[in-house]
Amino acid sequence: MRSIKTILAVLLCGLLAAGCIRAGGGKAHYPSSKPLTRWWWFARIIKKEDVKYNLDWVKNNGFGGVEIAWVYPLNRKRFYSEPLDTNYLPRQEWQSPEWSSIVAYAKQYADSLGLSCDFTFGTGWPFGDTKVKREDATQTWHEKNDSLKWTYAVVSWEYPKKGYIINHMDQRAFDRYAQRMASALAPAMKGSVSGLFCDSWEVETSRIWTTGFSEAFKRSYGYDINPYMDSIYSRANFDERYDYMKLVSEYVVNRFYRPFASECRSLGSFSRVQCAGAPVDLISAYTSVDVPETEAMLYEPPYSRIVASAACLTSKKEVSSETFTCTYGFPRYDAEKKRMDFRLRGKEQVADLKLVADALFANGVNQIIWHGMPFNPVGIDTIMFYASVHVGRKGNLAKDIPAFNSYMTKVCRYMKQGVTFSDVAVYLPVEDSWETGLMKEPDTQQPWAWGEYEMRRTVPPAELRGYNPIWISGNFLRNASVKDNKLVCGDETFSVLYIDASYIDLDALRTIVRFASKGLTVCLRQVPRQPGKNKSPEFSKLLTELTGMKNVSREFPGKTGIKPLVKGDSLPDFWCRKNGDEYYFFIANPHSMDLHLPLKYGQSFSSDTIQRDLTFNVSGRELKLPVEFRPYQSVILKIGRKGDPQYLDISYDPPVPKTEPF
């Protein structure tokens, strides 16, 4: 029976991928807009009374639910210079009946409180454990040892045991892993619907490989990739690198992300996924799952526009965010290089967090997942997680969490109204990122980030700021259509396709020419080249045909007549939703612009009211308004069919932040 359900789910996922029906169909997967919190279960004996103790606090502090994440035992010393403690602490064994039982109890008790209860689909970050066989483990080109195959032993529930990370390019490896995980979670899947979570990509990506890849590559591209692999990231091999990355993306999306989403649906669940860091066409990956999720601050807020765009293109209501991760920076060693500096942990300030939340709302996020709450036994609140703010009974945030949660709930409720509104689709330069290879400007805050393929710093062109532009990739364009001279994707229609890319894939160019011939206005800001090793004479012919059309121009807005949704000097970041004839604008306080990791302690401090004179163009009307931002306040403006503006009450005054923690 389960195999039939899985087949049906795979067929459904294929229809979604083809753009035949809407993924999610605008369905809300969470019963409320209240924030959830990630809830770290450290590897130990988990007791029912402790589960109840934690969940009661969650309920009483304005949360909508939890996401249970299984991680390391507390004796392992991850961030100290001395050797790791490898003594084995007692715990419910991973995926054992005892483990399944206590997980099911947590779900049942959450249900009794009216809380959502999601689960990570594994332990640690990437999927894997000690039961993964070597033939199912992740691979890289010319492996010299197994060091890159192991799970992050120091973050796994099974620590100090080592297990393999699954091969994300082999669906059979995923299927075998998923069967075990689904069986262990089965008792907990009863009751309300639980989301199943996949974290951001933390698998070795450099020269990622799988059995049969070489043969598949030759069939697809007509040449042998093997001679290029040792130097695939060199500048000389940019075209070969593009072909390699394109096939890797197809493998990962079709053999991991789509199967994961299908598996979740077959279990009566839904997928919530971070595709950040994956070697993929991000729009294709994020559109394949039910609830696309971003994260901040390890990915800065503007990145979230990619995630929210994927939701918009497939009519998904929710865009979630793992929020407040490493807000003040990733923990670092102290001056003596002996211990990690955790002095700000537990001293976080809610005004600083509001800066981050508002920046996310202005980039399309409408469901907050706190990062997060460590599991603490009854009467204890001294256990903390290393890379997050502290959600718990003690710490600087404790007294402010209920009111802050109420604020975020209110904003998210408004920003789930109707659908995202935009009139401009902007081409996501995936091809450029793959041709570029290594990051042009490595991030000293995040030395593990090395490839442009992550698109960490990709933002829309400055001239589109007032248009609330939506990213679309060349690969996803084939799922769209043109009707009445407009680009149609799910519930969304766009009057203009804006392209500012150095490279465009041949298949994408064919689609663009076809759409332009049907009347779609295209802004082609530069003359692109064909990526990949195999050049086709068709490319230049198509480009000549495209640039010769009257509805194709190098200028924007040019003769399109399209006005920006919002116009004004020093325009703040904003997001727009439309519900029937009503428009909802979330306009972030200007202090939420240009946030970078790490935030300074007390960066949110402000004493001045800021005014922006803004012009709104909706429903054929031009509305000029002075918009006032009091200290720490953002704005939601509702504009009705007749152009009547209404400021919605989302006021929340956090405590004035300190600028020095000690």
Where are these regions (language model features)?
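Boundary/entry segment of secreted carbohydrate-active catalytic domains
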Residues: 27-44
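Catalytic and substrate-binding clefts that recognize carbohydrates or anionic sugar/phosphate headgroups
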Residues: 126-187
